[in-house]
Amino acid sequence: MQHIRNFSIIAHIDHGKSTLADRLIHRCGGLAEREMSAQVLDSMDIERERGITIKAQTASLQYKSQDGTVYNLNLIDTPGHVDFSYEVSRSLSACEGALLVVDASQGVEAQTVANCYTAIELGMEVLPVLNKMDLPQADPEAARQEVEDVIGIDASEAVLASAKTGMGIDEILESIVARVPPPKGDPSAPLQALIIDSWFDNYVGVVMLVRIVNGVLKPKDKILLMASHATHLCEQIGVFTPKSQPRPELSAGEVGFVIAGIKELEHAKVGDTITLAGKPAAEPLPGFKEVKPQVFAGLYPVESSEYDQLRDSLEKLKLNDAALMFEPEVSQALGFGFRCGFLGLLHMEIVQERLEREFDMDIITTAPSVVYEVEQRDGTVVTIESPSRMPEIAKIADIREPIVKVTLFMPQEYVGPVMTLCNNKRGVQLNMSYHGRQVHLTYEIPLAEIVLDFFDKLKSVSRGYASMDYEFVEYRSADVVKVDLLINGDRVDALAMIAHRNNARYRAREVVSRMRGLIPRQMFDVAIQAAIGAEVIARENVKALRKNVLAKCYGGDISRKKKLLEKQKAGKKRMKQVGSVEIPQEAFLAILQVEDK
């Protein structure tokens, strides 16, 4: 065990984490030259294209250090994005050390800080690495100062590296061997293994990525998953180099994979503890928690006949994505579909994109909403995931909305616009500090405001320089109301939205006027209204198309013309009673694009 080193890499999006991982694998001979592809560990297409890591991946590398000892290095690649922060904390808790990769030309960013604090709380050894030193604008001194100011760790020994050219790779490996402590654990104690990640393989079922903390695991052992209380027979174990290689056993301190013929990803939850069914451990490893979706949206197939296909696609995605939740939902406007829960906006976009790309689905997505807690007059508390499920106003005693703590980093020239944006989003400033040129702001903002378009707005007011990270704080009472949209007097459930009372009228007027341009003209007038309860707060009309019925009358008596006009009027009236209005897809998106004042 003295020769094992478990480490992970912490970095902001695009700071060169996956490239550095490729270099380390290459240097230790994990893959032959011909098998090296860019970003070896990012196995999903969408991960490569967006340049982000979504699932944790590992590589066990053999490294011969300069004094001739051979070390077994386990690299655990972690996701870097806020939505996946639970996966990050589990990946980090499997390691004793972390490489903090900072782009020498850009300095420290928000997500790096959040993950780095997690690592420090877990008591890990953090080794700073200043990457991208091959760029002409790299400024190692400023970056080093920033690491010390913002994160508060000593960066005097930071390795200067460039993953692109391969500079500094040997120094990184040497410092891992020298500074990261070997794992602690007792091979003779009862088995305790932490599930770092799990995914579904079409051939063998669920593959679990585990870190053995105590004990030894061998094939043919009967294992027990402590959170879901399921027992399975362990069929195959091994390590990734990043290719899978079977092993006769995994013992304390090692990282590898376990295949046990599990069919449901539900059973192998990230963060759960595996132990032996015959000789179980007294208690599971600390830190396991159920991941709760924060953002909900309705997904509907464009063709209603594709409902079953959508369900199958979602089930397949769920095999690899335990945080995705969905349940059937019926909407009068859109037919049958699903109400889906996501960890955050990036997660939602990725699920949509994977549905369209991997399963070839055409889907309509309704406006994302967050979960509200509604206390009713009879004292019961219900959680509302969709605006259409909000109880009647008369029954509601109090509505509480989720508040998140947002950490923002930006160059100081953008502080003004960013603060204005946060205040417009009903934010409350908690803290502000200067670190060199960078400013660190902390705000509490309702999650509902972030879900709509906060991230896009933040990028535009700061010209792309600001970065953000958020975490859930609590539910707080809020003065929010449900705004219904009516088309010709019929409520359209899929278009309902929940808004803050101060913004409700403004948003209602905006949506209604935008809808007016999107609903095609009919043979009769179409009234578009927005209402809070029974009170209509905004209205627009889509004027009817009319045929000129008098065109065939040359001269003639006025009564003849009157008769034709009356006949047309009666026809229109009859049409209006039976006519239904097709609502185009753009109309649903109109709700998303309404700017708040």
From Swiss-Prot:
Q: Which residues form the tr-type G domain?
A: 2-184
Tell me which residues bind GTP. 14-19, 131-134
Bilayer disposition of the protein: Peripheral membrane protein
The answer to whether keyword Nucleotide-binding applies is: yes
Matching entries from InterPro entries are given as:
EF-4, EFG_III/V, EFG_V-like, EFTu-like_2, G_TR_CS, LepA_C_sf, LepA_CTD, LepA_IV
Report the function annotation for this chain. Required for accurate and efficient protein synthesis under certain stress conditions. May act as a fidelity factor of the translation reaction, by catalyzing a one-codon backward translocation of tRNAs on improperly translocated ribosomes. Back-translocation proceeds from a post-translocation (POST) complex to a pre-translocation (PRE) complex, thus giving elongation factor G a second chance to translocate the tRNAs correctly. Binds to ribosomes in a GTP-dependent manner.
Report what the protein is called.
Answer: Elongation factor 4
- Organism encoding this protein: Bordetella pertussis (strain Tohama I / ATCC BAA-589 / NCTC 13251)
